[in-house]
């Protein structure tokens, strides 16, 4: 997990485990980190789970998903699964508004397609 604190927000990039138990353990640590700031806290990366999964449902108790839940990102060559997300911690994201969201048409840079969210 990479955490970068900027003047107006905190951005956390992660690649979560393939196992649900490990993802849940990571989520507990991430929530503790998010609780420690008053700035908007963003969490993005490969969560290794689909939107309807128990893990994503648990995540949504504290984080709002800003990226498109219906836009597949994996595998990059022919995306069929939505497992990459951009989220924001609900307690610090109240004033954020999504102005656009998309999955970039970039099949070669990674095994996942990049996701882009623009906010105001």
Language-model region placement:
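Active-site regions of metal-assisted phosphoester/phosphodiester hydrolases
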Residues: 1-120
